[in-house]
Amino acid sequence: MAAELLEQPVLGSRRLSNILVALMVTIGGIGFLFASLSSYLGRDLLPLGHPAGLVFVPQGLIMGLYSLAAALLASYLWAVITINVGSGSNRFDRSAGVVTISRRGFRQPISVEIPIKDIQAVKVEVRDGFNTRRRVSLRVRGRRDMPLTRVGEPLPLAQLEQDGAELARFLGVNLEGL
């Protein structure tokens, strides 16, 4: 049974880099809020600088708007991290003759089923430079290429080649792009 089924988990947005960005935006938003309140109240609420000396109407008000924008952005980032958008699995079932690609969306799960007989090849893309792309995808008859790797940090080249070769061997199709 194990030889008939291959399941690959896919990492979503619950990564350390995303958590650090959300944390920095949250802390920055709180800092802008305290600076705005210090300007309004005329008292220093922050240990650094002297925000009480700022005139409220132009500077303090703008800092309050920055804190509102940071709160909205941080709320979105924490929601995406909590829901773990983009996580899921790639399930290859030879006995049923179907490939199921499932991901967790923002509002609802996303699932795509592809018959194995429609898969023409496993494609490995490597593009270095400013916009680096390293991904494994399925070349499907009558459709666009279906990406299988996670979005974000590129995989090491050795792991990318190994994953592509293992998948092509399992599905019995060609490996393209190397």
Swiss-Prot record:
Its main location: membrane. It holds the Pfam family Ycf4. InterPro entries: PSI_Ycf4_assembly. One of its GO terms (cellular component) is plasma membrane-derived thylakoid membrane. Keywords: Membrane, Photosynthesis, Thylakoid, Transmembrane, Transmembrane helix. NCBIfam families: PRK02542.1. This is Photosystem I assembly protein Ycf4. It comes from Synechococcus sp. (strain CC9311).
